[in-house]
Amino acid sequence: MTAHWPRRCARVAQCLDDPRLDVAPPNTYLAAMAILPIIEAPDPRLKLISKPVEAVDDGVRALIADMFETMYDAPGIGLAAIQVGVPKRILVIDLQEKDEEGGETIRDPRVFINPEIMEESEELSVYNEGCLSVPEQYADIARPAVITAKWLDGEGKEHVERLDGTIATCLQHEMDHLQGILFIDHLSRLKRDMIVKRLNKLRRAA
């Protein structure tokens, strides 16, 4: 997802505090990193189904570090490995919340490897979503307001958490990428075509 913060348009479920997920310290992913090119629609690679990670090794952690660097540079708040051309089930998310007192951005990098949604609510939340692979385009997307998800972190530790709010929306958005789905695929054909036309117009003007 992009750094354009999702705008909450409608919320049915009661808001819960975003959990502080147990991941490796930020410095684990903020050293010796490289910025990777982000694939943009309509690149056919974005339609690939990503494969599970068999072992969380140094190669996976190096990719995670590069993904964080790429996401922060874009800037964005979420990135899937397939968006940098790697069809593996790896996601990175950092909501980069603001410090209420100093107003500074607080980084909170989170890693999701082989994520699965185990339960989801019938209640929906609608957020104005964007995507680094569909630059400068946004649309209101309805998703389950509360989910229970399972995943591995960057150290291979399993987590099972009940999530809601922005983190739940962002995780579902990024997990769509693992199935070859973009946020615009949730729209009607008319709305999707309008976004594609705007995207092509911006590219021609660049």
Enumerate the language-model features and the residues they cover:
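Active-site rim/adjacent substrate-binding subdomains
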Residues: 19-172, 177-206
